[in-house]
Amino acid sequence: MTFVRELEVASQNSRAFNVTLWFIFIFGLLKLVPFALRFLSMVFDLFVLPPVNYAKYGCKAGDYAVVTGASDGIGKEFASQLASKGFNLVLISRTESKLVALKDELEGKFNIKAKILAIDISADSKDNYNKIYSLYDDLPISILVNNVGQSHSIPVPFLATEEEEMRNIITINNTATLMITQIIAPIIIRTVKKHRESGDKKLKSQRGLILTMGSFGGLIPTPLLATYSGSKAFLQNWSSSLAGELAADNVDVELVLSYLVTSAMSKVRRTSMMIPNPRTFVKSTLRNIGRRCGAQDRYGTITPFWSHAIYHFVIEELFGVYARVVNEINYKFHKSIRIRAVRKAVREAKQN
């Protein structure tokens, strides 16, 4: 007797067996349908839906976008691509010469206005925050991009992490991000309210936008980058909480998750299917604002680049970000990076 025939006979002779089969069927359906819907939603977000229209955020209406860490890499690309959409800019970074060059370039290329502020955010100075408030409180600001960030120089055990590096990571990634957001968010709320009450039909549905750069290092616990990983995980919960608070004020708050992108901080120089350059990554981010892409189960969160999104989706669905196997793989990966970095440092020391 075949297995199928045995099942048929059992189902005819046993009510309990039939109930069990129905239970298995319903349970499987309850698991499969949400999975299929999440997968289809990701596909539509990434490949089907049209790009976001930035008229709702005040492009070409004289509004400003504030970008921190604006002089290089991802921050510079955010500035350039927002300028191309018609936003005026406030550029905040450490190196004044780079800011001046970027200001001149974008004003000439896109016919927008750009203001700059050169400050060292790692100093966590009240004077710095007061400068931001006093210089820009009267501007019509509708977008804030919290891009400034710092990681470890190389993967390092937490117990061997230097105090200065640890403090700088927390100050730059967390304290400065929160302080700048506390200054700029009320200005965004005020700008949005003023536009919506102006009587201009084009501005009656105006919204504000706060983007904060997250990381897979915060999504997935990352041994040998423990302080950085924790700082980015903090931003996940903070940003999602802020999204709930500011929804009634018509301000969208999004945490932007990325895997590796070619940049000075990642120390990766070659692009690949999994590693875009800043221009490609920022383009995919601005295209998909307001959609989850790979972060289907995370409110106020977006994993915008297609290969990062699929990678995120697979980890969440098959393992879970806190799974031991994921932690072990992450540890081995960063341990190998540390070994290569230490060997390189030893070679360079001998040459000198």
Regions found by a protein language model. Name each.
Residues V145, I180-I184, I188, W238-S239:
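Hydrophobic positions on the long internal alpha-helix
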Residues L135, Q150, L159-L178, L235:
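Catalytic Tyr-X3-Lys loop
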Residues M1-Y64, R190-K193, A323-N352:
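Non-catalytic terminal and boundary segments that flank Rossmann-like NAD(P)-dependent oxidoreductase
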Residues E107-S125:
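Rossmann-fold cofactor-recognition segment
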Residues N237, A243-R324:
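SDR active-site lid
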Residues S41-V90, R94:
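Canonical Rossmann dinucleotide-binding motif of NAD(H)/NADP(H)-dependent dehydrogenases/reductases
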Residues I189-F234, S239-S240, G244-A247, Y259-V261:
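Catalytic loop of short-chain dehydrogenase/reductase
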Residues T68, A118, I141-Q150, N173, ...:
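Rossmann-fold scaffold of SDR-type NAD(P)-dependent oxidoreductases
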